[in-house]
């Protein structure tokens, strides 16, 4: 398990954009992490005040950060940055609301030089909330 302090060492993101709370499992090419979604998230102030729903783009950002933790925790990538290069086949299946625990899985499926492709999914209570293929560039 990777705690929040180690996540902050790997990722440059900070409040309010740090969207990974804890890593539950990690292997060479796959990671499972969680985000506790609370009513105090700043994005709920405007999305939507009477019916708070986590924006889909932030779910995808949380998945990207999950993959980033895996890649940036590797010795050869310490001190580097991971840049979002694209998203494909993104689908949103379930609303994510305050009180949900978002379980995020990212699996690297292809690497070529500094480019990596990840299959990612986010689930709440075992039900698919979002999924997609993410492309990253690893840079200085």
UniProtKB/Swiss-Prot annotation:
One of its GO terms (cellular component) is membrane. The active site is at 47. The keyword Lyase applies. SUPFAM superfamilies: Thioesterase/thiol ester dehydrase-isomerase (SSF54637). Pfam families: FabA (PF07977). Keywords: Cytoplasm, Lipid A biosynthesis, Lipid biosynthesis, Lipid metabolism, Lyase. It is found in: Cytoplasm. One of its GO terms (biological process) is lipid A biosynthetic process. GO terms for molecular function: (3R)-hydroxyacyl-[acyl-carrier-protein] dehydratase activity. Its EC number is 4.2.1.59. It catalyses: a (3R)-hydroxyacyl-[ACP] = a (2E)-enoyl-[ACP] + H2O. It comes from the Bacteria. Belongs to the thioester dehydratase family. FabZ subfamily. Involved in unsaturated fatty acids biosynthesis. Catalyzes the dehydration of short chain beta-hydroxyacyl-ACPs and long chain saturated and unsaturated beta-hydroxyacyl-ACPs. This is 3-hydroxyacyl-[acyl-carrier-protein] dehydratase FabZ. It comes from Streptococcus sanguinis (strain SK36). The lineage of its organism: Bacteria, Bacillati, Bacillota, Bacilli, Lactobacillales.
